[in-house]
Regions:
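Compositionally biased, intrinsically disordered or flexible polar/acidic segments
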Residues: 1-205, 213-215, 444
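A short helix->loop->beta-strand "cap" motif at the edges of active sites that frequently abuts
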Residues: 261, 292-300, 339
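Aromatic/hydrophobic pocket-lining residues that form the small-molecule binding cavity
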Residues: 283, 287, 327, 377
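Anion (oxyanion) recognition and catalysis
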Residues: 288, 295, 331-335
Length: 444
């Protein structure tokens, strides 16, 4: 299926049953089968308010009755004129119903027209990073190709399985634009991800600012995965090696996983809250069972040690390693079961100790020492990609190796807040320079 955007139908779309012309007023509805997500469309259907089966963006509560997303059109496509406002980015999301669950190849074409565009960043599904900070010269046209997995999910706060047969594509930037979009079924291996909030696809509010948005590394791992695989993330806040199974999340994976797929396990943070899930007992037993079952399906299990937190003693002079026993348990299981292991615990702890508590806090959600913001998720997923590259002989996940040396981790000594323009014009996806707290605008 192909969608052509803008006021002027393409020559190919005229009279074609396979090309749909999309206009700025086309708001999404399940009956129509495609369209843009706006404040109005989100409020008209309760299912469009469930982050896990949509784009992962919701308006700040004080903007819920506003009209921030107002698509416009010209000969180059459908765009937002107000891609950046004072307090963040405004996303434009196109949503399409697909015929089946499974993996799809997405080809997205963007055209700048007469106006240069800065900071184009592309997400798929529930805020999964696909492309980062592209700047366009006038009349420049670019095509992006990536894979998207469509799968059942149990949303956070829900007990039942939701059947999802939609694809969401979100663009942010100074003037985000859709020109053409092609979605086609694609048979490729799937990388299933399991875990807790440090891994999960987390929602964000808009106006969007990355440092004040929760994000797990699984949400940005898609940026590093090549076009030879697709990612299906089933991590959620609060999950451990026990309730991931008992609440039904693992059943979704068992229903879909096949020979040649991968399944990544990263638990520990929530296991540590229960005595029967101690590192050397219940936690270890549950991981062993997961590994045996995944192998029985012909898939490859992979263990990731728990993310280290920004946890220090009271005067911030000594690091407090709260996850050491669980990281050691993972290493023991890896050696025993001959399972590839990615030691995220060690590499994240080394980074936190190197930069110190204050600077490390810039990569975590404000006031949270364990859950990363979008900058931290980008950083941690990059660490994982680099480690996969290093052990690729035993962990052959198809990644974009050209990106693995470009993980950005230095802390810059900027004493004042960065503006959105400065953030976009920087050479890389830089860490935040200040804590940006979303606040309701004062009425004039």
């Amino acid at each position: 299926m192909t969608y052509n955007f803008g006021n002027t139908p393409s020559a190919d779309s005229l009279g074609s049953r396979h090309i749909t012309q999309v206009y700025p007023e086309d708001s999404f509805s399940y009956k129509k089968g495609y369209g843009f997500l706006t404040e109005e469309s989100r409020s008209s259907d309760s299912n469009l308010k469930i982050n896990e089966i949509n784009d992962g963006f919701q308006p700040q509560r004080w903007y819920s009755d506003s009209k921030l997303i107002s698509p416009q059109a010209d000969d180059n496509g459908v765009y937002l004129e107000n891609g950046i406002v004072d307090d963040g980015y405004i996303p434009i999301t196109f949503k399409a119903v697909v015929p089946h669950q499974g993996n799809y190849k997405v080809t997205l074409v963007l055209s700048a027209g007469d106006i240069p565009i800065k900071g184009i960043t592309i997400f798929s599904g529930r805020r999964r990073l696909e492309s980062l900070k592209g700047d366009y010269c006038p009349r420049e046209v670019r095509a992006y190709v990536f894979n998207v997995n469509v799968c059942d999910i149990i949303p956070q706060g829900h007990n039942e399985v939701y059947t999802d047969k939609t694809i969401d594509i979100t663009i942010i930037g100074s003037r985000p634009v859709f020109t053409t979009l092609t979605i086609e079924e694609f048979d490729t291996p799937t990388i299933y991800i399991t875990g807790d909030s440090t891994v999960a696809d987390c929602p964000a509010c808009y106006p969007y600012y990355p440092e004040s948005s929760y994000s797990g590394w699984g949400q940005f791992f898609t940026y590093y995965v090549s076009n030879l695989a697709a990612v299906s993330n089933h991590a959620h806040p609060g999950l451990n090696t026990e309730n991931f199974r008992t609440e039904g999340h693992y059943n979704i994976i068992k229903k879909n996983i096949k020979r040649g797929d991968y399944c990544i396990f990263q638990f520990g943070h929530n296991d540590a809250k229960f005595s029967h899930l101690a590192a050397d007992t219940g936690y270890t037993d549950n991981l062993r069972t997961f590994i045996d079952e995944v192998r029985s399906f012909g898939a490859t299990p992979i263990i990731v040690t728990p993310l280290a937190g920004n946890t220090w003693n009271s005067d911030k002079t000594a690091y407090d390693d709260t996850m050491l026993s669980y990281a050691d348990a993972c290493k023991k299981i890896s050696a025993e079961k001959h399972v590839p292991i990615i030691d995220l615990h060690q590499v994240s702890m080394d980074f936190i100790k190197r930069v110190g508590s204050s600077d490390a806090a810039r990569y975590f959600y404000p006031g949270d020492c364990m859950n990363t913001n979008d900058f931290g998720a980008y950083l941690m997923s990059g660490f994982i990609a680099k480690e996969i590259k290093r052990i690729h002989d035993i962990c052959p996940i198809p990644i974009r190796t050209s990106l693995c040396g470009k993980v950005y981790d230095p802390v810059m000594n900027l004493k004042r807040p960065m503006t959105m323009e400065e953030l976009m014009e920087s050479d890389d996806f830089v860490p935040p320079m200040h804590i940006h707290e979303a606040k309701e605008p004062q009425k004039k």
